[in-house]
Regions:
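Conserved beta-strand hairpin/beta-sheet module of binuclear metal-dependent hydrolase folds
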Residues: 1-38, 42, 155-166, 171
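Short alpha-helical
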Residues: 6, 26, 56, 80, ...
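Short, basic/glycine-rich phosphate-binding loops at helix/coil junctions
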Residues: 13-14, 107-109, 174-179
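Residue-level marker for buried hydrophobic side chains located in beta-strands
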Residues: 18-20, 49, 72, 162-164, ...
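Metallo-beta-lactamase
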Residues: 24-26, 79-146, 150-221
Length: 234
């Protein structure tokens, strides 16, 4: 599902759903409408899985947890980030230093209006309860892909050939110079070398449908998409 410059994924199984990411805080109405669009509701969300705890992916996670008791799961290394024990978000200073770059200023204005700098911690984030496939609709398998943040995770659906890549591999962004599989621009990564290295992790996943955190759905071997992004990154 496409929000305002960011995506989330709804995995359905009977009456229950798994929600992967939640968009910006300002995307809440769109998020709830997207659940209704697939015949679901906030009460039916079995869990929120978070790729990483930036505001444009975490925006409504605490709302769902507090209002509906929805558990919010993410990698152990990302738990303190979700609580806002420390920031791994691009700083205002970094954005201002890069404001001359194409697309950065319009993106920044939109991000501010959508709650990009709002304080939206998850009060009780939870690490994945067990290794391997999660016992949730879609049976997603967390795949650790640090670099964008310390605890960034992609999610693999082996039986469906789907990879939900979050911001470890995207297919577009308002600040990007081109479309197609790529890393986000450098200013957004906590540790760019690790982000580049994790493209090799994604290349090992069997799939032909890439659902990125930003940009359109990408169809074709995920391996090829990851290799293309790595070539552009080097």
């Amino acid at each position: 599902m496409h929000g305002s410059n960011t995506n989330w994924v709804i995995l359905t199984e009977g009456d229950a759903v798994t929600l992967v990411d939640t968009g910006y805080p300002g995307d809440r109405a769109r998020l709830l409408a997207s659940l209704a669009q697939v015949g679901s509701s906030p009460e039916a969300v079995a869990a929120v899985l978070v790729t990483h705890a930036h505001n444009d992916h975490l925006g409504s996670a605490e709302y769902l947890r507090a209002a509906h008791g929805t558990p919010v799961y993410l990698h152990q290394a990302e738990v303190p980030h979700a609580r806002r024990d420390f920031p791994h978000q691009v700083s205002v200073g970094t954005v201002l230093r890069n404001a001359w770059r194409s697309g950065v200023l319009p993106w920044a204005v939109h991000a501010l209006r959508s709650g990009g700098t709002a304080h939206v911690p998850v009060t009780v984030p939870e690490a994945f309860p067990a290794p391997g496939a999660l016992d949730l609709p879609g049976r997603p398998v967390p795949v650790r892909t640090p670099g964008h943040t310390d605890g960034h995770c992609a999610y693999h659906l082996p039986g469906a050939g789907v990879v939900i890549s979050g911001d470890a591999l995207v297919s577009g962004h308002p600040t990007a110079r081109t479309g197609g599989p790529q890393l986000l621009p450098d200013l957004f990564h906590h540790e760019r070398p690790r982000a580049v290295a994790c493209l090799d992790v994604l290349a090992e996943l069997d799939g032909d449908l890439l659902l990125p955190g930003h940009g359109p759905v990408h169809r074709g071997p995920v391996r090829d998409a990851a290799h293309r992004a790595r070539e552009f990154a080097l």
